[in-house]
Amino acid sequence: MKRWIWVTVLEIILGSLILFESSFLLKGIYVLIGIWTFVLHFRSKEQLFWVFMILIFVGLRSYQVYHPTVVPEGELVGIIRLNRDDLKINGDFVTGIAELELTSSNHQVLFQYKMHSEKERALFEEEEADLTLSVIGKSKPVNEPKNRGDFNAPSYYRSIGILRMFEVKGFKRLVNKPSWMSLFQNLRRIFYLKINKQPESFVRTYALLLLFGKTKDADATVIQHYKRLGIMHVLAISGLHITLFIHMLEKVLWKWKITRETSVAVIIIGLVIYGYFIHWNISGTRAILMYVLAQSSKKFHWKLSTSDCLGILFLLSLFYRTSIIENVAFQLSYGLTAILLLTSYFAEHNLQGKWKKTIWIAFLTPIIALPLICHYFFTWNLLSVLLAGLVVLLFESILIPGILLYALAVVIKWVWISNGIVFFLDALLNGLNHIFAFCEQFLFLRFTFGTWSTIAWILYWIMIYVALVCYEKSCFRPYSSVVFSIASCLIALSIPYHLHEQIIFLSTGSQVSVLYIPKGFNQATLIVRGEISFADSKGNGIRKQSFSKAITNNILVEGISQLDSIVLTNASLEDSDDLKELIQDFSVSEVVVSKNPSEKRDFGELDVLTQYQEIGERQLLSGVKWELIPANGSKKEVQSSMFTIQGERILIVED
């Protein structure tokens, strides 16, 4: 293991923490750790020189990203170049990533346009991949998230090199310039559309997810099951499915008695082509380049270990785009791969037998990675430790060969073969999906940790760094793995503990939501105002976004999986349906509801203790006092609420 690689990586991680940390005390601590690590590990002047050059280069790249020359303000005229595979159509709106060509500069932007006719919709849905438009529009910043648990669009788009949104007001189609890349992209899109047009099945969903890295046309329910159980994190997001694909291809080529050198060349060519198929997404690029670098090291005797290859790619990624370190897929892919290297090394040197090694790797990897995964996905199901190992075995032996054969059969129109694969694999995957859906119901098996503080970040990454040092010195023994697993769990447990009381106001559209978190572990009270129903010009009811979807992530991000009380004010029957969805995601002690005076329908049964509040005062199980104030005689029959939380009074006015 090349020490300078991983010390440089650690220095960059510390530098990013210093940049984003608001506390001067913590900034000072990180600076001292960085200086101490630097002095301790580097004795050679030549090493010091090159590491200084790397750090200076990364610093300059960071300055270019965070102090950029952005798209000019105001109304602009230019040329937009789009790839239809990057577009997403939601109702009348189409959004996607595009290249904006102005008179004096080019920019990557977030394209947005509201379609006005079916002809325009058909234009964006054509089979040809590339689309060139002469446009007039306005540049504006990407919308900031309203709540901590909302999707952080500015951070995500900055991490992939996009700093502005371009809202198109009008356009005119231009002729595309022919090129070999556009020909390849057109073939890719035809391939993609052929699979996407097949009847809905689990095999089709897996083909879209793994072969193309696309989730927009996949079954949302299936994806949600996998997210909650951790299957998607370990496979698609980390890029480990590509590693499984490489292992399978190696076995096939060796069985055909093809030499190792020829096999490597064939695999590298195939991986480069596949890289263009997935548009060189972050996790796929990491998996492909790690294989290429590892094989190059063997060929040219560079003596690079797998962990060295991972560190070099980390540094090269920062040279390419420094802001990539903000990307969730980047952090998960590199973090999970580093942890997988540690657990694989432990299994290889301390265990005998393939099955025993597989079980231990499947068990240790998610435990050590628990804080990392929960930081981004908020929850982790205990059964996923076993399910992840099962899915990996199934992917390597059955699913990946089956999915590849299915895709080939669809393209060359072998209908009977594709139907046969769908019949057999769908039976298997349908059974797995029922198991996953059944496992989701057990809330006591679900871990919820929320997002961590900067201190938890630094402790976790130092722990990983120490583990890598142990890897280098060959002292990664069974006791070490136990220590790292316990340390990882302790860091995870420290994340959701609240040292102080908090009252958090959540912005959920037209609704008012208040989350009260007392001092301690996993306790909270949620106050939600019911949605007011509106009618359109024809008298049809209009419902806005479900509050359960808007609120759930904002509770999970705080590390809360148990609610002492849920208060729903001014509720209608539609709100009770949202309430039932919310209760499925949390362990709830009590629900107290005040119905809208105009609501005469029955709410039905809920799975928890439910009480209905009339005019007057009530004390909840959490100690919060709630007073329902009579309607003030206005045209709308609504009732305002007064909440008293630890001496603070909050008035929610129903206007």
Briefly describe each language-model feature range.
Residues L341-T448:
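Alpha-helical transmembrane segments of multi-pass integral membrane proteins
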Residues L123-F124, A129-I136, S179, V415-D655:
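Non-globular, low-confidence helical/coil segments that flank catalytic cores
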Residues I80, G137, L210, S238, ...:
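Divalent metal-coordination and catalytic microenvironments
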Residues K2-V9, Q47-L48, S305-C309, K354-T358, ...:
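Membrane-interfacial loop-to-transmembrane alpha-helix junctions, especially the N-terminal start
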Residues F24, G34-F52, V222-V385, T454-L499:
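Hydrophobic alpha-helical transmembrane segments in multi-pass membrane proteins
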Residues M1-I5, K177-N186, T205-D217, Y276-S283, ...:
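Hydrophobic alpha-helical transmembrane segments
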Residues M1-V71, C470-C475, V591:
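N-terminal leader/targeting segments
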Residues F57-L229, H233, K549-L556, Q562, ...:
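Membrane-interface helix/helix-cap signal primarily in integral membrane proteins
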